[in-house]
């Protein structure tokens, strides 16, 4: 069943409403630009159902993006690994699989779609896996990558890390 917004509210809003409406035991997300192949889905599904991962993220190990996108992506993934202590190589790959309980336990807003693995970890889901997926040239749409994302990304990461560590007791940040 599809959900149609009156306008484009962004990827986080789309994921959030999809997670709210989902009913299956396993939820798969994938970007509509088809840079990831639907043929990868059965293996992700198996990793959730048989290998008992809470979340499995795709890893575009070999990328077909311009140099101007791959360097910032590597920096982003390094910073996200350090801030979250999650050993993923590709936090932002749109191809992911989740147990239903994971997507029902997190709320995604703003630009937090980049940090779903961290949000899941901070919600108590620590069995996070990764699978190498084939990256393909974009078939549809245009990239949203730009200076604004590069500047806001670190601020969002700080927010997620802060909420993960101090969300339930924010005064502990001040030593209280």
Role assignments for model-derived ranges:
Residues 1-3:
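Acidic donor-binding segment of Leloir-type glycosyltransferases
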Residues 5-7, 11-21, 38-119, 136-155:
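Acceptor/aglycone-binding surface of glycosyltransferases and processive sugar-polymer synthases
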Residues 27:
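Short aromatic/hydrophobic "clamp" motif used to bind/position activated sugar donors
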Residues 31-35:
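The conserved acidic donor/metal-binding loop of glycosyltransferases
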Residues 81, 160-163:
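Structural signal for membrane-spanning alpha-helices in multi-pass inner-membrane proteins
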Residues 128-131:
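Conserved alpha/beta core of the MobA/IspD/sugar-nucleotide pyrophosphorylase nucleotidyltransferase superfamily
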Residues 162-176:
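Alpha-helical bilayer-embedded segments of polytopic membrane proteins, i.e.
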């Amino acid at each position: 069943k599809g959900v149609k917004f009156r306008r484009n509210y962004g990827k986080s809003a789309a994921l959030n409403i999809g997670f709210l409406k989902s009913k299956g035991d396993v939820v798969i997300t994938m970007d509509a630009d088809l840079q990831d192949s639907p043929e990868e889905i059965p293996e992700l599904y198996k990793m959730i159902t048989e290998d008992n991962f809470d979340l499995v993220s795709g890893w575009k190990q070999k990328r077909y993006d311009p140099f101007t996108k791959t360097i910032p992506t590597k920096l982003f993934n390094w910073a996200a690994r350090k801030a979250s202590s999650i050993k993923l190589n590709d936090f932002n790959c749109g191809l992911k699989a989740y147990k239903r309980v994971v997507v029902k336990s997190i709320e995604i807003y703003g630009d937090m779609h980049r940090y779903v693995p961290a949000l899941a970890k901070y919600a108590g889901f620590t069995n996070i896996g990764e699978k190498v997926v084939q990256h393909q040239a974009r078939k549809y749409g245009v990239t949203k990558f730009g200076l604004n994302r590069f500047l806001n990304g670190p601020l969002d990461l700080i927010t997620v890390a802060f909420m993960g560590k101090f969300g339930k007791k924010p005064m502990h940040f001040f030593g209280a």
